[in-house]
Amino acid sequence: MIAPNFPRSSIPSPAKLICLLLCFAQLATLVPQTHAQKTTAQPTLEISVGANNTLVIPKSALGKEHLLSVSRIPQALAATSTGLSGKIVRFELFADGVDLYESTEGLVVTKDLPARRLMTTFPIVEQDGTKVVIDFNRGMRRLYTDIWYDASRRFDPVGRDETLEIPQARVFSATKQDNQIVIRQSVQVRNRQFSSNLEQQFEVRYFLTPYVSGGYSGKEAPASDLRYARFFESQAQLEESTGRSSPKMARFDLSKPVVFHYSANTPADYVQAVKDGILYWNRAFGTNIVRAEKAPDGVTAPDPRYNIVQWVPWDAAGSAYADILIDPRTGESRHGQAYMTSVFALSGKARARALLRAMRDLAAEKADGKKDKHDAFGGWPATGGVCEVNMAEFAAQYAQGLQELLANDGLTDEAALLASQDYVREVVAHEVGHIMGLRHNFAGSLAATLDLKELDDWFKAYVAGDKLDAYTNRYASSSIMEYTVFKAAVQVGWFIRTQPEALPHDKAAIQWGYFNSESPREGRLLFGTDDQVGTYGDLQRFDVGADPVVAAYSQMSDNIRLLPNNVIETFIAAKAPRDPRDRVPLAEVNLWPTRDAISISGQFSSMLGWFNQNARSLRVEQPFDFIGDLNQKNRAEAHWKSLNDQVERLGGVDRAFFSFLPVDLKLDLKEAPKGVGAAEKVSATNLLARLKTLLAAPAYTNFVGLDEKRYSFTPEEKELILKRGQSLFEDLEKELVKQACVRLETVKRDLGGEVADSVAEDDITAKLEQRIIDLAKLVLTAKDDGKRLKGKVDKSIVEVLDFKYDDETRLAAAKALNDNTGSFKGWATDAKGDLNKQLKDDMEGALNIGNFKDFKDSMLSRTLREWYMKQQEILKLLPPKAGQPPK
């Protein structure tokens, strides 16, 4: 609406004035009302810094409230910060020292009963009639461990008082910056309960500023809205008399611009990407409230004067991360910092290969059971913040994304750089979103408007430099606060760079948190954060797509397709590492079929998991007004329908669950998958042929190494790669069958029965279980003409044709027919009985057992006796049919 425009010479009549006022009143209702409040004037800091980093406290400042904010900074790996919970404190003078007390406001239910919360006592260095000088270093020998935000929304009187001991410390710097004192203390930290012999090194940075109440009132998020959006919140405080816990949302005061400074060491290639990631949030606010400026040289995070996006040169980092220092009473965000690590920066193909090697090593290290090192802070990771991720998960998905990028024949250094710039845009916007208060939204992928095939097509066109007009206003996630896989993150970064709007959930969440909009609830927007990841199967970190079964199938397909590329990249990393000291002779390069099989079968297991009645989907359950026993049946029906729809999209049970296995089953593969590429069958012959083709392709005949130099494989090296690849693919065939059988042993399939109250004869569960029986029969009975065992039965020499699959695989196949995981208890009874008879007859015939009146296994020679005992172990898992006569 446009306000009336009067000529300068005209003087409106009273009636016109009333009309004008009404128009402006109406206009005001159309403009979003910010939560910005007129802040009370900040009092001047009276405390100053004295000689030798002491604090000089005027006696007029004693008893006055101050805000003490704290960041702890590890002194290993990267010196990045994690904010701890701020405290409102006051100084009080006694004869032998100056006490520091925490305010009891919000920590006790009544002021009628006196309470004092002593934090520490500082030794007095000197004093006179107007001031007292204290030794901050000697007094501050305990470090409170509660972090700046709270996830529980409940008042925790114990957790907020947990401390660590500081046996050694040195305040090496104390300065007054603007209206704050910044104290930097180097400490050794010890946990008195756990790891008492471990003393970790940290810098503890204290920020002390005068505090006055009443200028900014915080906001408590309505609990009923948290299903649709959520902000970080302060540690909960108690309301007087009622004792009700009340956390406050972490938000900036919008009465002034929110300025972010990107650090001066940000590489020139990424400055614009970082700025774009910061300024993205203006689209969500609907106004240019957020600004991006370069930080002065020498300024690094955390700094109380700036919100900083700090570039961290760290190629092996597990993520980027952020945190905020907030007012513990109101939730007002005072300043925040995001740490943007160089792991996201790909300046070209060589850099991509170097990062691929680093991510593979990191993922392999975690897969081998080497857990993250934790510090003494009750298990907090050594680098922390609100975006701490599982490093193995991050490394695995990033390695997969880099591999897919490098697999593009037309990839140029320019395309790799552009992809990394868009990746940085996405990551910076994500971290700045945290600083603005937003929590993760791992449901962003569930509201994607690109299906998996469209995302693949977009990525290929993007790398090739083709036009992308067909993807305007399409996105792989509805929220920047999602953890997306590499190509989806690049797509979202491209969206930020090319589209004028914010992603839907980002805008709705900001409008809800800062302007009291009800759009998240009204639109029933999909939202799920960290503490819900274990509740919903489709709420995962680093997933992609709206349908979890289809997404897992797509991921499995990618894993299989890229196997030959993985082989070549492994040899490239050995031949041309980033540092020549890391070069490995190609003959010593190892490949891991078990690891590849576990990766592929992991996605297979994820797909099967949706047959379990306890599996829950956020996307399926979001339309329900409530979640409970009263609508359990309705929700199960919705889950069953979703599962059937996804299996149908994949071309049916045979296509979805068995077509990739390297076995000869009679499958119905008439229907092709819709919206996703078909997973190819794992075949050593086909994979070896593709490996040979790739070695002859331009991308690998003359390639850029990790050190940015040009290399080629010699004919002898190519022959070695092909032989090693052939061994890998042949072993992978066998290992994948075993891993698939292992997964089938533990995955329940009772959802269909929960919906129908009875077991159907031809639904997808029945079809799945019939194929499980077929697979088990094949694995248990298949013979290998090249494997023959010779030995004696009593005095007779016999030759036994051995089975194709090893004993461990056959045992797994037999266990896959167990009663506990099927749609009903006796689902495989007949099949097990038939197998028992077939295997028993085969074994007894091979050993001529029928010729002996009283056969004993002691009559067998060593080789045959071992074989016989293993068959007996399998037969125990396959009970004979009732009434079947024993032999």
Regions found by a protein language model. Give the residues of each.
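Auxiliary tRNA-acceptor-end handling modules of aminoacyl-tRNA synthetases
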Residues: 38-266, 295-415, 424
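Short alpha-helix carrying the canonical HExxH Zn2+-binding catalytic motif
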Residues: 420-436
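Boundary at the C-terminal end of the N-terminal hydrophobic targeting segment
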Residues: 27-41
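Zn2+-dependent metallopeptidase catalytic core
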Residues: 60-63, 68, 72-73, 267-291
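N-terminal secretory signal peptides that target proteins for export/translocation
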Residues: 1-14
